[in-house]
Amino acid sequence: EINQPIVYCTPKPIYTIEDIRKFSIDPTDICRIPRDIIDDDRIWKIAMWGAPRDLELIGKMQSTFAPMASFIEENHMTTAEGFKRGNRKHQCYDFKGLPLVEAKSFKPYYVSSDELPIVDFDDFECIVKNAREIFAAPHLIIKQSHKNGTFLSEVLDYDAVFNHSLLGVHGNINKLKYLSVIIGSRVFSYYHILTNRKWLVERDELEAGDIWQTPIPSPSDAEIAEACGIFDELAVSPAKKEKAEQFVRHMYRLKEYESYQIDDVIDYVYDYFKKKQHSVS
């Protein structure tokens, strides 16, 4: 029957005591997708980890708010990935002596320059010729891989350099702080769990293009000021995120049941993926 739904099966890996990878098909791994929506690319990842109501919420976010790329363009910001050493065929002395932000020791929201190592090398593969502003203050630095399901970023008020595993955005410091508050939220992680083709499938990080496509609410001056206050508190106490989370959910105009949806995905879906058989789900 041409009107029959598509049966979509997404078995999840399980881990035995012997830690041998096996696959089993649970009833929750099978869903029936109406044929009239199979051309919507979003459904496949959402059907794997979410529910029909998640497709509605993702659609609402995408249709209500412009992508971060538009926010960046409207606010005359500069973006790029950091330098690359790789085959190290270029010599460049421009970065010598500058603070170096490294992904492995990345500190969210803010790190003082005296806590960072200094660049003591001059061999590079890519030296970011056309977007050097990303290394100039004020700048937002985004870590493309997550920590326990949360994405980290920091806003620095001094020049610093970083490699291509980090993204840089140069622009107005208050608007950068606003973006940082959003990036560290559960809403941001929820969106990418359910839309990113590779996260929770084959990669544990986001690509730059994925991040730039995140829907971002357009804030008022008062909301920017509120975000800055929240950011400054997070810079001192990064773990105290309740106020930040409430602010972000208000910006996205989330209803109470939509907030529960987001928490369910983070608390159960991500938890399942990360902790395997020890998951709360």
Please describe what each predicted stretch is.
Residues 13:
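N-terminal glycine-rich flavin-associated loop
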Residues 53-225:
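Polybasic, glycine- and aromatic-enriched phosphate-binding surface used to engage nucleic acids
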